[in-house]
Amino acid sequence: MNDELEQYLLENDKQIDITYPEQFDPKWVVMESGWPCFRLSSLDNQPWKEMYKEAEALADKFYVHRETYGKGWRSLTLHGLNEDTQSLDSYGDRKESIKQLDWTWVADECPVTKKFLTDVWPAEFLNRVRFMLLEPGGYILPHQDRSDEEKRLSVCNISLNNPEGCKFVFKDHGRVPFDDNGSAFLMDISNVHAVYNNSDKPRIHMIIHYELGRRIRDFFYVLRESYYTNRG
């Protein structure tokens, strides 16, 4: 294991502690809670394993991703500019790039996944949507995808599988409790985080960047049901 990652995990690999207030406030949850993640438990019964099989079947098509601070990290884009879409900020005018986003051939090969994204996912607009594969022994060094000024739950990370030994760890917060059977979490990626696959299987997740548009009500219902399920 990389020395930097080993030290990071020693300092931060613990159970995340989240306390749910009695009253649900969607704006507070997303914008003000300071939570590093939030499980969308109302989506727990989706066909994650079928989606995993679709992604796994394309494993040899994935592109190497961010070699500068990772090892064994690869991606494949379902919705974007092409099947190897990077951060939209790297293409110039972000607004113009967003206008060009569309389904790639990958989505055509993954009908169950595409159906989830079009019929179930509670947002009107999809930005970049990618499968992310981390090979056995692979890792992603501690990094921050957004600035501190953009602190909010803004991206969805779905574990299509999460073999025992795989860890996604937020600095100062702890380990995200992803489920190997599939689970969806809203994430605040302004927090420093790192990932390590200490297993003998590829770890495949799906990352959804999105805009709610006119589906605020749908998102509200998913958030509220998840909140009270998580709270118990």
Question: Across the structure, where does each feature detected by a protein language model lie?
Answer:
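Catalytic core of non-heme Fe(II) oxygenases with the double-stranded beta-helix
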Residues: 114-185
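Non-heme Fe(II)/2-oxoglutarate
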Residues: 1-120
